[in-house]
């Protein structure tokens, strides 16, 4: 989730998706988001943009920050400590979508799957992360479609990126 930029660059350019995967091409008109709980919600990009909007300035650090110092060195972006940045994100809050889909507190965790793919251990796979239900139901989580006042760039997860402040 990072690119080579100075630490804490105010433009947020260093918060790009880069877990070693190629940046996928996405046609937003054909793309949709599925949220599965007791009910399944399928939302188009336009549907998401019609929902209530929220903004947040968030500093993020790539999970792979510092991996250039690992032995043996992994095949990936050779980050030292520069994979940190701050950006202004805009999108729709996650919690109402989870509630509409019937994802409740009886769930243990929520798995988020990106379109970016990579190879780990000779197995091709999509980038995935999970959050506990407690974390996922926080009010400050955003499904962001804008970054710093413009559309979310492809290298930052276009058309949609989960933003979890403090994670």
Can you say where each PLM-predicted feature lies in the sequence?
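Structured, non-membrane catalytic/scaffold regions adjacent to prosthetic-group chemistry
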Residues: 1-167
């Amino acid at each position: 989730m990072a690119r080579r930029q100075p630490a804490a660059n105010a433009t947020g350019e260093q918060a790009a998706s880069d877990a070693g995967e190629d940046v996928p091409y996405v046609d937003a008109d054909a793309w949709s988001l599925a949220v599965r709980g007791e009910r399944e919600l399928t939302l188009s990009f336009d549907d998401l943009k019609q929902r209530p909007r929220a903004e947040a300035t968030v500093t993020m650090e790539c999970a792979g920050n510092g991996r250039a110092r690992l032995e043996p060195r992994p095949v990936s972006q050779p980050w030292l400590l520069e994979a940190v940045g701050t950006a202004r994100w805009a999108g729709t809050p996650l919690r109402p979508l989870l509630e509409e889909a019937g994802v409740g507190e009886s769930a243990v965790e929520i798995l988020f799957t990106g379109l970016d793919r990579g190879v780990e251990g000779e197995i091709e796979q999509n980038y995935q992360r999970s959050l506990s239900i407690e974390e996922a139901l926080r009010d400050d989580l955003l499904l962001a479609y804008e970054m710093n006042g413009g559309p979310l760039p492809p290298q930052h997860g276009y058309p949609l990126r989960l933003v979890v402040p403090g994670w």
